[in-house]
């Protein structure tokens, strides 16, 4: 997950209220993101799932 890049093609701006970009990985395979998108609060990691969050609404 690359944060704070301002490349228009690759960047994503989140809707109001969900101003953090995140990626979700399964702990069994940290190389392939399962889900990505915008969220209001960065979730905590669990035994099965790891979250990687940006502190901005732009990511690629």
From Swiss-Prot:
Phenotype upon changing residue 52 to K: In [Lys(52)]-CTX-I(41-60); no change in cytotoxic activity on INS-1E cells, no change in intracellular calcium release, no change in insulin secretion in absence of glucose, decrease in insulin secretion in presence of glucose
SUPFAM superfamilies cross-referenced by the UniProt entry: Snake toxin-like
Disulfide bonds listed in the record: 3-21, 14-38, 42-53, 54-59
Molecular-function GO terms, alphabetical: potassium channel regulator activity; toxin activity
Keywords annotated in UniProt: Cardiotoxin, Cytolysis, Disulfide bond, Ion channel impairing toxin, Membrane, Potassium channel impairing toxin, Secreted, Target cell membrane, Target membrane, Toxin, Voltage-gated potassium channel impairing toxin
InterPro entries: Cytotoxin_Cobra, Snake_3FTx, Snake_toxin-like_sf, Snake_toxin_con_site, Toxin_cobra-type
UniProt subcellular location: Secreted; Target cell membrane
GO biological process: killing of cells of another organism
GO CC annotation, single: membrane
Tissue specificity as recorded in UniProt: Expressed by the venom gland.
Main location as per UniProt: secreted
Subunit structure comment from the entry: Monomer, or heterodimer with alpha-cobratoxin (AC P01391); disulfide-linked.
Family: Belongs to the three-finger toxin family. Short-chain subfamily. Type IA cytotoxin sub-subfamily.
Chain's role: Monomer: shows cytolytic activity (apoptosis is induced in C2C12 cells, but no cytotoxicity is observed on INS-1E). In addition, this toxin shows insulinotropic activity that may be mediated by the modulation of potassium channels (Kv). It induces the increase of intracellular calcium release. It induces insulin secretion from rat INS-1E cells in absence and in presence of glucose, without affecting cell viability and integrity. In presence of glucose, the insulinotropic activity is increased, suggesting a possible synergistic effect with glucose.
Remaining remarks: Negative results: does not induce direct hemolysis of human erythrocytes and it also does not induce potent vasoconstriction.
The name this protein goes by in its record: Cytotoxin 1
Taxonomic lineage: Eukaryota, Metazoa, Chordata, Craniata, Vertebrata
